[in-house]
């Protein structure tokens, strides 16, 4: 396919259009005069009448005021009666319906590349006709250098607990000699250039060369922690002088979107936030000039231009246009989805990322690897549209691509080639080869120029391109190439341009944006409010679940604190206080899920905030306002269900005052947790902070320990705890009521006595002070939430580098390059030899599939659009075979069903309905045995983040290789695979989280392949193994894959953008079309001759051009638009072909087992025995935990903080027992420690296990281990960490509180706490295993916490719990913990104390009031260790039986 648009072609095309128009008008006049028949006359009269109507309508528009005229156009009526009559009506373009917008865009753009070109040409012609000037942006960068600070460490640069603790200590100490060693690494090194308007520039270079940093720097999105020198300017303005984020856009390589929104909604809101920019002013100027000149525009072009120029539209015609040209119209109403929620494909997400920015009015685009996951045909189509945008509208576009096909490469005007932070070439595309020929390198025939440019800088690939005749080859380093470029005429020309300052007077006034945001404040607020409301509707399940859960807890609470069982006396006053305090706990903890819900949205917020879509306040205020009705609803439910049933004071006014206070508490709670999430910004840190906050506000609320009993130096905590005011307000409201005014013998009322004993003796007006204080806290937290999002950026981590690696980087000079080059040819040969030696014993197997169909239940969105079928078919009549030693490519456009077919064949589908026959080696496929002989490289690279590359491969080898292979051979094989896939240079790196830390996209992809290859499978499925890789990395991977296939293995790969070399490395091709139908299966042949011969044999299919990539040509000629153009269904053509008949014969032959063969059978389901599985899983968990400071260090620090707070707050109260209140205080110390240290551990483990669960699903599908082995390892690795926590708690709190010293009592204290931490942690694991997502697990967890609080025996002692709930008391683990702690400490103490105005021993009081008896401690000890065993067993059961991954 030739280049679509050049400047000469544009001018020629304009002249042709004018000539065609004149000819058509002349022809029309001639033909009109020649027709004399009645029917023709009638038709002519009808057309004339319509034309006259249209002209009258346009005249009416012209008479309208300017505001209305700019919103009105002639819009073609959708008339089903007479399609030939093009009657138009005056329409307000802001009120076009969804159907009208759809029909309009379908009419304007049928064939995307051609019709989009026509549309842009017509727009430009209209603009030029009246002399309106378009804004343009020229971007210059001069001597740009970017440096990053890295922390130097000795040994492996891994974030272990020890390294993290040492770093924290050093940063806190700030002592000379203790500060971290820092090193500066150059990311970009003195680069200069000009990105010109009206030209397409391609940015090439290997991963890690600085492409992303350059794009971010030029677009003004660079991280503030990086040191930047040099100058960047737009039209002569420096970056500090305007708002670069509104003048240009950076399209990230990471696809971050809100999963609950549809594709259309994502683009609609993006369009709304970005505004219309200069379009409105251009349209106003254009309309005025046309009116003055008497020019009547094309009605369709007028409609389109007006529709996209009006600000603040909720539904925009521009969205429909972008959906169409990006091929997203077929999934416009599909949810975006995420890892756990079904949505659009990876390729569609990548296109959505592009569409999200180009839907706006931006004139300068910096696009980072926008083709990852897209087939070459789709990539070509998108880049062609971008080229048209650049050439016709004078946009400035710089695009980074990894593997551009030759046809896509030819669409660009300029090339920038980078390596190691330096620019090796920046100049015209046509001159790139000439420059490298001057350096001694020549691009071979049938080699893509882009692939050549990327490989010529590589040490291992450069030699094959050497063409110097006068001297022998010597490695030409990056520094040498950079110097040669600086001496070239291309760089000299750049220097000349940069030396001449840009004339600001030439800059269009709308080229540069000086406003931070596109919309007025009110419009920003409205847009954010409507989006937040939409997301609340989409997450309605969570809110309904929370509300129902609260109602259930309220019903339990009111039947525990039943009014018929409680009197108005001093004893029962404690129970009423307990009920009030419990209400506060419930509404406080109910806000806890706000943490996770806020955190999950932050990544998208930070992206859109950096793009200046909206300010933080526009995001936070709607989030706050829309929670008010929910908060009010939950408060009403709680108060109305519990108030009168429990038996609080019956006055209606007091009921409403309690309701108001509970509402204020709930608002404070959700505001506080939102604020903590915005400050901490990661789920682990915010969970820890949330736990500490709950601990603090409850301990200082005045209930657990009364204010008079607090140490004097800590009483300030009472006044800054929000819950204090909730406690004061509720207590004053209740105990100053008339029914509590009975006088005691001490001449004080019962109510006043109760308030005074708790330090809550305040006057009635303190209720209103409390309400105001709580709303004040709410406002304060929301202001903090806004400020945190305004000033704190997305979380990152300082890079860590070893001293050895830093020395290597600093010493990388030509001398080192020459030394490395001397070994170059030898290393290349070794690479080929290593690949060929992967010959561990295996059984060659074929895979046959016949008439495979795959259906899913029809999505609700499609049903709403009128789709009547109950099932949606994604694969239709797929028949084929995969054979040993044959490398098969599975191809098709994005969304054709490639991954779906791979999942079906591999047995990875968890939803839907599969029909048809699949056989392995001639025998029906049995998934359990098939998993042992197959490997699956998934499209999403899912790995444990806290282990190294080498450990990931070793883990796979240990569990999947045959047990008879000895350890030495396994290690050698692992080493071989690592070297073959070229991971040896990074084998000590942590895998990390995608897009956050650790490996890059291409390194992660290669690791996925290595993990599967090391299993030595007979059949390997690879889903897009080269996506995200540059040309050289893709060649490395495919060379390794080809060598594996040559050993006799069966391999099938889906592939999107193969170069000619990679495509022709395959032996066979399976090609699917949209709808999951097969249109080709057969041999490729030498130079793809068989495939080309087949398609060229079909009538109307255009012939392939010389040196054209066969893969791109094939996808282009079989695309949906091509099918429509030539009226052919390629699936039907294939079904009726001789090739199909031959293939059916082959399938029949392979469907029967070969003579003497046996069905697959293994004596055991897994390769390793149970002990081997557990040992290997435990080994992985050991390293993962040791390298997870965000998890283990945070919860350990929480334990230290909680222990210190508890020790200080209850300082030396352990032996000072005088009355019942002193016993309650000590019991409160135990209660808070048990509940909140346990809650923190349970909450902290949720995100960790959730992350590892995704890895478990992949590894379980691969048949690596039994679920129980994974679960047991996960459970066992927690024990030493929890042991250390319990020990630290005991060592700190025991002496500070001053308990009785005896080995027996100390041991019981430690044992109770250790068992508590165990069962809380295992509870968190269990909840993750039985729920689909982290937020649901967090909400369900909160209900467990509330029950553990209510039935712990602290708020309501066992003796007072109604008999219909006493079973729940015995079922609650915290009741046994507190029993063990309090009874072991005081159950044998015979000291007399005053209890409710009578004398009793401590032991007797414990027995009478709490029901705790010293002789029952052996039973308590048994029950305490039973709970962790039960929760751990349930975790193992659910993690094995349930699978929430939807595929």
Curated annotation (Swiss-Prot):
Entries under SMART domains matching the protein: AAA
Inducers of expression: By iron deficiency, methyl jasmonate (MeJA), salicylic acid (SA), 1-naphthalene acetic acid (1-NAA), ethanol, and cembrene, a macrocyclic diterpene.
Domain ABC transporter residue range list: 173-445, 847-1099
Topology versus the membrane: Multi-pass membrane protein
Gene3D superfamilies: P-loop containing nucleotide triphosphate hydrolases
Entry binding sites for ATP 1: 205-212
Keyword Signal on entry: no
Chief place of localization: membrane
GO cellular component terms attached to this protein's record: plasma membrane
InterPro entries: AAA+_ATPase (IPR003593), ABC2_TM (IPR013525), ABC_transporter-like_ATP-bd (IPR003439), ABCG_dom (IPR043926), ABCG_PDR_1 (IPR034001), ABCG_PDR_2 (IPR034003), P-loop_NTPase (IPR027417), PDR_assoc (IPR013581)
Residues covered by the ABC transmembrane type-2 domain: 523-735, 1172-1386
Molecular function terms from GO: ABC-type transporter activity; ATP binding; ATP hydrolysis activity
UniProtKB keywords: ATP-binding, Membrane, Nucleotide-binding, Repeat, Transmembrane, Transmembrane helix, Transport
UniProt key word Transport: yes
Binding site for ATP 2: 892-899
Ranges annotated as spanning the membrane: 541-561, 575-595, 628-648, 659-679, 685-705, 712-732, 769-789, 1191-1211, 1222-1242, 1272-1292, 1306-1326, 1336-1356, 1364-1384, 1419-1439
Localisation per UniProt entry: Membrane
Function comment: May be a general defense protein.
PANTHER family recorded: ATP-BINDING CASSETTE TRANSPORTER
Family, as annotated: Belongs to the ABC transporter superfamily. ABCG family. PDR (TC 3.A.1.205) subfamily.
UniProt protein name: Pleiotropic drug resistance protein 3
Organism expressing this protein natively: Nicotiana tabacum
Lineage: Eukaryota, Viridiplantae, Streptophyta, Embryophyta, Tracheophyta
Recorded name of the encoding gene: PDR3
